[in-house]
Amino acid sequence: MTQLHNRTAGQETNRVMTPDELEAALRAVGAERYHNLHPFHRLLHDGALTRGQVQAWALNRYHYQASIPAKDAALLSRLPTAELRREWRRRLVDHDGTEPGTGGIARWLKLAEGVGLDAAYVESREGLLPTTRFAVDAYVTFCREKPILEAIASSLTEMFSPTIIRERVSGMLANYDWVSEETLAYFKPRLTQAPRDVDFALAYVKEHARTPEQQQAVIAALRFKCDVLWSQLDALYYSYVAPGNIPPGAFVPEV
């Protein structure tokens, strides 16, 4: 496992950063902590995982995907203006869709089915790793309870997602003959949705984080979100790669 460093650009300063300096500090968080650096993702993208290990990833990731609308709805309910609510409401539509069978959650279920999982089992979330449940639920709670500025800042991992999506799609298509473009259809819309969402969230954070304390808080919020993503992969690696200690009640691959 790689070791996270405790310091990030912009982490310790008692002066107000310019908006561009703040953006640079936020991007430095991703350069150091985003989960594309995790060994599990390298194995996934390089074709080094078994079908069962990929199934474990898809199953556990579903809990994260299905919880995104919950965290967005929690934040949406606290936004003070119609303009902000309209902007944030698009995220709910992206994931929940406008009718049954549409939206990101439905596409992720198709991905899970495409790698050999039963959709009803995935939706039940019965086979989740405990760490997956704890990490994702902590993120939903963070967005429900933290100041709006910090909750919005925590979404800025999307600054880094287009790169990992391209790596994931190209790597999985090249290395797993049982994965198709249809299986990975979840990711194509995210290549346009994520940058659109970032444009709003980053502009909001740069405008409203005006004091040293606020700026450090938004950097910490992004670090927290990176930790949420990283910890999920730690659990997958420990349970399904090495040492392979699957917790009681969690999904056990057949292959």
UniProtKB/Swiss-Prot annotation:
Gene3D superfamilies: Heme oxygenase-like. Pfam families: TENA_THI-4. It comes from the Bacteria. It catalyses: 6-(2-amino-2-carboxyethyl)-7,8-dioxo-1,2,3,4,7,8-hexahydroquinoline-2,4-dicarboxylate + 3 O2 = pyrroloquinoline quinone + 2 H2O2 + 2 H2O + H(+). Its EC number is 1.3.3.11. It is an enzyme of class 1 (oxidoreductase). The keyword Flavoprotein does not apply. Disulfide bonds: none annotated. One of its GO terms (biological process) is sulfur compound metabolic process. Ring cyclization and eight-electron oxidation of 3a-(2-amino-2-carboxyethyl)-4,5-dioxo-4,5,6,7,8,9-hexahydroquinoline-7,9-dicarboxylic-acid to PQQ. HAMAP family: PQQ_syn_PqqC. This is Pyrroloquinoline-quinone synthase. It comes from Granulibacter bethesdensis (strain ATCC BAA-1260 / CGDNIH1).
